[in-house]
């Protein structure tokens, strides 16, 4: 992708989210690779958001914090994926320097019928914002869920209700867009 964008084959993209495996945490060769390819292809680090699951980050907490700090020092953003799906603890969250909390879809999908799920989403969103993190709701499949997420103040959403997964090709880059949920994306949240 970086090669194609650098060669003028694709339009630059606003944000590219890349899932990392738990094995990547603490892998110095990965950091070296990023340091090498960034100047070669002119990758704007702020346009890349690395994602790691909460379970992987907590299982590797000793390495996760410095690894995330190093990525952020290089200008990349970081997201904690599937938050509250596994071993969640706000103690861990307090020490992980992530930019985004991706609220696990298991809370989102039934939040219209289940007041506990809705309350969990509200609380995670509030705590995330107090900590200076943006929130992302996974598994958004209906307009009704999207509207409730807007009311709650969730920053971003992803799911079939917004766009279906697509093969990666030239048209994908032209047609894809990120859905901001917050009614005022300049609010600083």
Model-inferred region functions:
Residues 4-5, 9, 19-28, 47-61, ...:
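EAL-family c-di-GMP phosphodiesterase catalytic domain
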Residues 6-14, 42:
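Catalytic core regions of nucleotide second-messenger enzymes
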Residues 33-37:
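A short, hydrophobic coiled-coil helix within the histidine kinase transmitter core
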Residues 38, 44-46:
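Conserved C-terminal helical docking segment of ANL/AMP-forming enzymes
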Residues 64-65:
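Acidic, serine/threonine- and proline-rich low-complexity intrinsically disordered segments
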């Amino acid at each position: 992708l970086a090669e194609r964008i650098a060669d003028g084959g694709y339009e630059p993209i606003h944000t590219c989210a890349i899932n990392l495996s738990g094995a990547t945490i603490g892998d110095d060769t990965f950091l070296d690779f990023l340091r090498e390819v960034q100047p070669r292809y002119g990758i704007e680090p702020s346009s890349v958001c690395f994602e790691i699951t909460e379970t992987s980050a907590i299982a590797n907490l000793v390495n996760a914090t410095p690894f995330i700090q190093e990525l952020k020092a290089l200008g990349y953003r970081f997201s904690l994926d599937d938050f509250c799906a596994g071993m969640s603890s706000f103690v861990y969250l307090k020490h992980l320097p992530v930019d985004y909390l991706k609220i696990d879809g298991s809370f989102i999908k039934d939040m219209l019928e289940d007041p506990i799920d809705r309350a969990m989403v509200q609380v995670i969103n509030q705590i995330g914002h107090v900590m200076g993190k943006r929130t992302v709701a996974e598994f958004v499949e209906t307009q009704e869920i999207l509207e409730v997420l807007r009311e709650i103040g969730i920053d971003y959403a992803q799911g079939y209700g917004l766009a279906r997964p697509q093969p990666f090709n030239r048209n994908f880059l032209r047609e894809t867009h990120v859905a901001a949920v917050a009614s005022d994306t300049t609010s600083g949240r």
